[in-house]
Amino acid sequence: YLYDRCDEQGLLVWVDSPLHRSSFLGDVAYFATPQFEQNGIQQLQEIIAQNYNHPSVVMWGIFSRLWMRGDDVTPYLRRLNDTAHAMDRSRPTVACSDQNGGLNFITDLIVWRQDVGWRKGSTDDVAVWRNQLQKNWSNLRSGVCYGGSGFIGHKSYTAQTAPRSNWMPEERQTRFHEEYVKNLQNDSLFWGTWINNMFDYGSARRPYGINGEGLVTIDRRERKDAYYLYRALWNERKPTLHIVDKRRSLRDRNRQAFSVYSSVGAPTLFVGADTVAMTQYAACQYRSDSVEIQGIVQVKAVAGEQCDSVTLRVGNVLKPKRQPVPRRTAGPQQTN
């Protein structure tokens, strides 16, 4: 059903074979046995045979974020790559990698899974990585994918240097995507840019049983700020004007700065009765200087026929008390 809809809507599909990292709580993903290898080749053959006639399918995935542990996996990856080419010479092969080594030179296309600046360093370090890739490996047909967790129910009052396993505010995810877009958008080095997940999804390995890297919540009801960033950048059919951090309607500091995503030109920002100047930070991203506000204030952004607004309560705000998160134990976990 999904591929049929992609055929109708003109969405491009990358179909993956199930060779990923390692099994849950396992150390290796590849076992050098004839049975293991033949099973993987058969699965790839069946995937190609079942989806060959879908015009939306444009590439065959060979592996994803494979760990280089145990036996050398590169001969097996070459067999998988040759199998895909033998069955379908019209489509390229692709892989997603976050490792160094020979496995990155096997498929026709390679997509780099990147997260510099999420747990270590600065998000600006992705520009350093990009420049090194341009200098040393520009012969590779490279794409890039990235993402970070953010929960709309988690609010941050101060900048955090690193995410915590049980406290991942949406604001940090938003800033991560903003900086990556600024550094990588429309870079000719990359043939494509991929976001890790469109939707949050259930994961037994994550706090709360949810992987929060999506742009939309697990129940599909709430769109995160990062969603509107990419809608402004990538959706030419639907105009976007969005004030960032609207869910943080209670703020304890009197000096506030605002960000707006706009695909319809520079917005005009009204804070109460005042007009606040905005400057373009990056493509479709606009930021204001900090302004002094107090009490209940309406903030409104206007650009052409588009308008977005939010009402804030500023000053003397009690910070929400964090609820203790119980330690995870063995056994099935609730995801919603």
Task: Provide a role label for each language-model segment.
Residues 1-140, 150-152, 159-161:
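Active-site mouth of glycoside hydrolases
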